[in-house]
Amino acid sequence: MLKLASLNRIVLTGTLLAAAGLASGCSSIDRLSQIGESPKLTAIDNPTTQPGYKPVQMPMPKPETVSYNANSLWRNGSRAFFRDQRAARVGDLLTVTVNFTDRANIANQTQRSRVSKDDSGIADFAGSKLLGGTAQKVLPGRLLTTDSESLSDGKGLVQRQENLQTSVATVVTQVLPNGNLVVEGKQEIRVNFEIRELIVAGIVRPEDIQSDNTIDSSKIAQARIAYGGRGQITDVQQPRYGQQVMDVLLPF
């Protein structure tokens, strides 16, 4: 059984290494064809047609009857005299101001120590020697002795500081039954041989949209903000495929 398990493990490891090598080879061919060229920007497309897209489902309140004000110059929820310029329908644009500043400094230290010692024997009982003569020489009076010691020492330190300030235009991809808007936007900027990507998605309440059709990222519910890149600099920062595979397979 042990030999069979070892054989299966070797076969699995070889299969994974072969797959990794094949993927690495295909990726290497693509990279060889792009030597000396800047990375290409992705095409503009409909985010709802992307693989893995799923409509947002949130708990909704009961529908309410819309009331209209008779003989009024203003429409409910309107902030402009002639027309509300804020995003309200699928396909409308909404500018998101990303202002993210995060700083964390956490330090933990734990120390634990425990020492126990037990010693038991039955050399004398009720005034008489239980072990005597030859038996006392062979069997010691101390029948059981235990000694244990446990020590635990742990330290943890987290220091993080992040700052991101930018703006990105998003598209309304869905209007929920309660009127909230699902927005998603992607921005790509190419500088030399590196592309910086900014992705913003989440749920927006129409009342939080400013009159200039902008909203702060802190007012987006279920916000998903990703800022990264791809290109030569990002490629150098990534470990090689073989190293990543070995990090997964090796238990130590």
UniProtKB/Swiss-Prot annotation:
Q: What is its main location?
A: membrane
PROSITE patterns linked to this entry = PROKAR_LIPOPROTEIN
Q: What is the membrane topology noted in the UniProt record heading this document?
A: Lipid-anchor
Q: Does the keyword NADP apply?
A: no
Q: Name one GO cellular component term.
A: bacterial-type flagellum basal body, distal rod, L ring
Keyword hit for Hydrolase: no
* Signal peptide limits: 1-25
Keywords, ordered alphabetically: Bacterial flagellum, Cell outer membrane, Lipoprotein, Membrane, Palmitate, Signal
Cellular location(s): Cell outer membrane; Bacterial flagellum basal body
Return one Gene Ontology term, BP aspect: bacterial-type flagellum-dependent cell motility
Q: Where is the lipid attached (S-diacylglycerol cysteine)?
A: C26
One MF term in GO for this entry?
cytoskeletal motor activity
Subunit (UniProt): The basal body constitutes a major portion of the flagellar organelle and consists of four rings (L,P,S, and M) mounted on a central rod.
Q: What the protein does?
A: Assembles around the rod to form the L-ring and probably protects the motor/basal body from shearing forces during rotation.
Supply the PANTHER family for this chain. FLAGELLAR L-RING PROTEIN
Family of the protein in this entry:
Belongs to the FlgH family.
Specify the protein name: Flagellar L-ring protein
Taxonomy of origin reads:
Bacteria, Pseudomonadati, Pseudomonadota, Alphaproteobacteria, Hyphomicrobiales
Gene symbol? flgH
